[in-house]
Amino acid sequence: MPRVELEIPEDVDAEQDHLDITVEGDNGSVTRRLWYPDIDVSVDGDTVVIESDEDNAKTMSTIGTFQSHIENMFHGVTEGWEYGMEVFYSHFPMQVNVEGDEVVIENFLGEKAPRRTTIHGDTDVEIDGEELTVSGPDIEAVGQTAADIEQLTRINDKDVRVFQDGVYITRKPNRGDA
């Protein structure tokens, strides 16, 4: 009967609604559905308990995965997750703007139509000249937003050694922090 108990940090509140675990802190809130057969996840006072009646390799690995997800949620609502990105161009000066819940890149390789991508979840995108900072409490939403921005400037059918324009991830969060 494997059982893992995770201590809830002081400034964090955790609630359970059926299969969903919601963690709230100073930096926001994150909700995640944690379900797997024969694994129970519950909030018991100031701890989150992950337990199972089964004792096989798949169940043990899933318990470890759930433990990592919950630790990432705790880290996200207390300190947050942050990606650093940099705008690089050599041919045409591109402009990167945030309009509502979208990131808009104009004049990429001289294109007339702007390229757009959505900002996921509670993620904030800040632009300071050629530097972008993507931050928020949910590691998956922050990472997906950064990846979408990077993929938005992907160049096809041209020599990537010559056309190096784009927005690139230059700094990732240290996942060992959680």
Swiss-Prot record:
Keywords per UniProt: Ribonucleoprotein, Ribosomal protein, RNA-binding, rRNA-binding
Coiled-coil annotated residue ranges, if any: none
Listed InterPro entries: Ribosomal_uL6-like, Ribosomal_uL6-like_a/b-dom_sf, Ribosomal_uL6_a/b-dom, Ribosomal_uL6_arc, Ribosomal_uL6_CS2
GO cellular component, one term: cytosolic large ribosomal subunit
Membrane is among the record's keywords: no
GO biological process terms on file: cytoplasmic translation
GO molecular function, one term: rRNA binding
Superkingdom of source: Archaea
Gene3D superfamilies per the UniProt record, alphabetical: Ribosomal protein L6, alpha-beta domain
Annotated PANTHER family: 60S RIBOSOMAL PROTEIN L9 (PTHR11655:SF16), 60S/50S RIBOSOMAL PROTEIN L6/L9 (PTHR11655)
Function: This protein binds to the 23S rRNA, and is important in its secondary structure. It is located near the subunit interface in the base of the L7/L12 stalk, and near the tRNA binding site of the peptidyltransferase center.
Family membership: Belongs to the universal ribosomal protein uL6 family.
Subunit: Part of the 50S ribosomal subunit. Interacts weakly with protein L13.
Protein name listed in UniProt: Large ribosomal subunit protein uL6
Source species of the chain: Haloarcula marismortui (strain ATCC 43049 / DSM 3752 / JCM 8966 / VKM B-1809)
Chain's gene name: rpl6
